[in-house]
Amino acid sequence: MGPLSAPPCTQHITWKGLLLTASLLNFWNLPITAQVTIEALPPKVSEGKDVLLLVHNLPQNLAGYIWYKGQLMDLYHYITSYVVDGQINIYGPAYTGRETVYSNASLLIQNVTREDAGSYTLHIIKRGDRTRGVTGYFTFNLYLKLPKPYITINNSKPRENKDVLAFTCEPKSENYTYIWWLNGQSLPVSPRVKRPIENRILILPSVTRNETGPYECEIRDRDGGMRSDPVTLNVLYGPDLPSIYPSFTYYRSGENLYLSCFAESNPPAEYFWTINGKFQQSGQKLSIPQITTKHRGLYTCSVRNSATGKESSKSMTVEVSAPSGIGRLPLLNPI
């Protein structure tokens, strides 16, 4: 396509007075080899942007052309016209101040609004044919820019395998199809969903610590889609069965005993140590310097998660040998 011609500026005569998609227009009854066509540039333009109705294959020997809003060629729908002789622009009642017509018949609409959607009529008048002319129609199909969806959730801190979760994708519209994503993978639509809008609510009967997300929802219409910001769950779980380290259970008197306990838990669990059922101390680590035989017995690490209300424990038996020389039989002199 060639460059646009500059809009005429020698004389102006004024009477009293989203996203858009465009289809190509073929003019009717035009007795030339190359048909006049119109295309929108860009084919999709966001509300508030500019769109150019670019005319191709404009015939020679023209007297002028007129643009109308809609398919009725009357004064009320008259936007603007261009008279070749004198390079005159004439503006009608439908002119908003945002339209610019060029000498090649192309029409620029600036700061596009929803009201700009619909049909446009271009009437081309050839010299010697001022009354009949050639008329064609060009239609904008309104394409609204999708809003950015967002997720609401009934519980952002669910308990593992216990709480039912309900994700809702907003906003609600019968015109949207809703799609859910987990860790970048689309989730299958439940067979119970009969209408696309019903999929805007995602129900999870239970959730595990491996299903924290991120979760995203996407809304789609016939022209495109828009995805929400990711949402990550804080799944409460545990405590799992704890482990005690090191695992060996035999000590000599006078050695130092160091034990640590760990259990998977969110939030972190509280730790308690008991020896033979008697509370010893709290915390993950237990240390007893210079252990003696009185420290023999059953060592238990108990863990508790106040958020989940769960508890768990692990026990081990510790043996302590007597000091060297204690508890041994005296040596006998050989006969």
Swiss-Prot record:
Residues 147-234, 239-317 form the Ig-like C2-type domain. This is Pregnancy-specific beta-1-glycoprotein 5. Its main location: secreted. A motif (Cell attachment site) lies at residues 127-129. It is found in: Secreted. InterPro entries: CEA_cell_adhesion, Ig-like_dom, Ig-like_dom_sf, Ig-like_fold, Ig_sub, Ig_sub2, Ig_V-set. Disulfide bonds join C169-C217, C261-C301. Pfam families: Ig_2, Ig_3, V-set. It comes from Homo sapiens (Human). Residues 35-144 form the Ig-like V-type domain. GO terms for biological process: female pregnancy; heterophilic cell-cell adhesion via plasma membrane cell adhesion molecules. Belongs to the immunoglobulin superfamily. CEA family. The lineage of its organism: Eukaryota, Metazoa, Chordata, Craniata, Vertebrata. Residues 1-34 form the signal peptide. GO terms for cellular component: cell surface; extracellular region. Synthesized by syncytiotrophoblast of the placenta.
